[in-house]
């Protein structure tokens, strides 16, 4: 299973910053209904207000595995202030990063090899899709379900990928270009 996953998935970082508590007036202006948002960029950004009234802004601003956390926070704070100029003077007090498993087809996969059941490749949607796919595997194991549509998704790899993602700097520049022209 480890060999399979290693040849079909790249591990990347995603980053988050969180602001100080915002005034109720500013909260209502930024997100009147308190919803979660995603943009449509290749280097996607996502944001929402936290239950205690802070702005949470996250994204993958490059494909590096060694971006400094402070540098990432600086990039993200510029991005959020571009989208929300009202946050120009807002202080961002928290930042962190986490690992993502991204498959070449950008789809999660489940399956079984030699009696070992697996699921991987959530690509940044881990909490919701992992819960769902865990339930799928549980139903398959208990016999309550015969097949899952996720088992039907063909596993993809690239002939040039041997666990060394040497191509990612080129892909990052390409995605940055696509974001720039759109």
Question: Where are the regions a protein language model picked out?
Answer:
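Short, surface-exposed charged micro-motifs
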Residues: 1, 46, 109
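Single conserved hydrophobic/aromatic residue that forms the stacking wall/gate
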Residues: 1-6, 10-11
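Short Gly/Pro-enriched turn/cap motifs at secondary-structure boundaries
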Residues: 7-8, 35-39, 98-100
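Small-molecule pocket liners
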Residues: 13-15, 45
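Active-site beta-strand termini and strand-to-loop segments that position acidic
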Residues: 19, 49-50, 111-113
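Conserved FAD-binding catalytic core of PHBH/FMO-like flavoproteins
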Residues: 22-55
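Short beta-strands and strand-loop turn motifs
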Residues: 57-60
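C-terminal catalytic lobe of FAD-dependent flavoproteins
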Residues: 62-180
């Amino acid at each position: 299973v480890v060999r399979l996953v290693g040849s079909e998935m790249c591990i990347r970082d995603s980053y988050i910053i969180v602001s100080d508590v915002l005034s109720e007036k500013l909260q209502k202006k930024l997100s009147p209904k308190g919803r979660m948002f995603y943009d449509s960029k290749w280097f996607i950004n996502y944001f929402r207000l936290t239950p205690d009234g802070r702005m949470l802004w996250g994204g993958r601003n490059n494909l590096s595995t060694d971006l400094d956390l402070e540098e990432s926070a600086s990039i993200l704070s510029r991005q959020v202030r571009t989208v929300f100029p009202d946050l120009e003077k807002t202080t961002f007090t928290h930042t962190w990063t986490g690992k993502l498993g991204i498959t070449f087809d950008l789809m999660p996969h489940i399956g079984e090899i030699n009696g070992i059941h697996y699921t991987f490749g959530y690509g940044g949607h881990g909490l919701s899709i992992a819960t769902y796919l865990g339930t799928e595997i549980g139903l398959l194991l208990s016999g309550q379900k015969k097949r899952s549509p996720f088992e039907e998704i063909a596993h993809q790899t690239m002939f040039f990928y041997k666990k060394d993602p040497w191509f990612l700097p080129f892909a990052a520049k390409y995605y940055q270009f696509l974001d720039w022209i759109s």
